[in-house]
Amino acid sequence: MEERLKIKDFYITVDRCLVYKDYAIIADTHIGFDVFFGEGGANFPLLQKDEVIKRTLNIIDKYKINNLIINGDIKHNFKPYPKEIKFLKEFIEFLREYINVILIKGNHDTFISSAGYEIFDYFELGNYLIFHGDKEIKIDRDLLKEKFWILGHEHPSIKLRDDVGAILKFPTYLLNKNYIVLPAFNPLSPGNDLINNSASSKIIKKSYLEAEVIAITDIGLLNFGTLRDLREFAKTHL
């Protein structure tokens, strides 16, 4: 099975990232996800930042990139937890020792500017327009129509049941003719099971059922066809 798949002139990968030239694009790192549970009183190990850094370093080495674009929801909490801000700074500053890091704003990304970082509503890269996808962006309408969109926000995933009844869950890419939605990069993010749930993003609400579902599995990338067809199959076979 494929570890990477060429779409247009970029690649999607089993590493939850899109690679274009010397750029890697990820979304939904949600730094501070573990802090949220810890502040709530749960005995939750604060290891998430280190795991996200480990996965990012793997991408840098594996795909020989010089630029990393984080497409929104870089951090998790809406409240300004000091520990989360500390983790966020450690995360960004560590990565900047190796590569150029570009930050795009998501709906969770409060307080990032006040932490001293420049953050964009969108970023143009060749024929691609990169924005988080939680809402429409203020941009020339013709430009919006002519560019292929690279989105995050949705945390797309699917749940399937195997022949012994075990439930398997896979993070996925959603590929439409006009856009691609990236899976959440944070391995702790549960994902939105789009076989059983609706898309949360208004940006893709009218078109996501026609998107191809490309799942990240232990044996590589698997294309399950359109989400609409997969839902119909699931009604009778799963």
Curated annotation (Swiss-Prot):
<dbReference type="Pfam" id="PF00149">
    <property type="entry name" value="Metallophos"/>
</dbReference>
<protein>
    <recommendedName>
        <fullName>Uncharacterized protein MJ0037</fullName>
    </recommendedName>
</protein>
<dbReference type="InterPro" id="IPR004843">
    <property type="entry name" value="Calcineurin-like_PHP_ApaH"/>
</dbReference>
<dbReference type="InterPro" id="IPR024173">
    <property type="entry name" value="Pesterase_MJ0037-like"/>
</dbReference>
<dbReference type="InterPro" id="IPR029052">
    <property type="entry name" value="Metallo-depent_PP-like"/>
</dbReference>
<dbReference type="GO" id="GO:0016787">
    <property type="term" value="F:hydrolase activity"/>
</dbReference>
<dbReference type="InterPro" id="IPR004376">
    <property type="entry name" value="Pesterase_MJ0037"/>
</dbReference>
